[in-house]
Amino acid sequence: MNSILSDLVKVIGMERDALLTYASYRLGNRSDAEDVLQDCYLRLHERFTDGQEGAKLNIRNYVFRSLSNLCTDRLADRTRHLTVDLGQQDVVETDTDNRESEYYRITSMLDRIPEEQAEVIRLRMYGNRSFAEISNILQVPLPTVKSRFLYGIEKIRKAMKPRA
């Protein structure tokens, strides 16, 4: 096993929960997140076993960036194949429903701000990434990452304030 592949295995082992949480918030459900995460692992494994190595590659950031790209692709596929469930029934709200309601509220707020800002917030809050790591993942300057986070949070706060 080459060194980059062994590094990939270590990163996947250490970051699995953070990657799954991040993908779950991007995609809206754990099942799709697990599928995308598995696809990401397989693609990266194939890439690195084919001898495509990068001497100065930061594996952790590369994995997050690859996962982010696959989530974006999955979301784009969803909008092309959007279906509507006409058989929904009203049910009594449970704790799971409360968590789902909170999830949809957060997702709705993130959908109202520019994608660049929402992506930084997701990586910071659900991916547990530092601003420096996010800068590397998104390949943008550190001050840009910080300003996107700040402006995104400010827009969310304004949206949450009750209107007088």
Task: Tell me what each language-model feature is.
Residues 1-21, 25, 34, 118:
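A short, charge-rich alpha-helical start-of-domain segment used by transcription regulators
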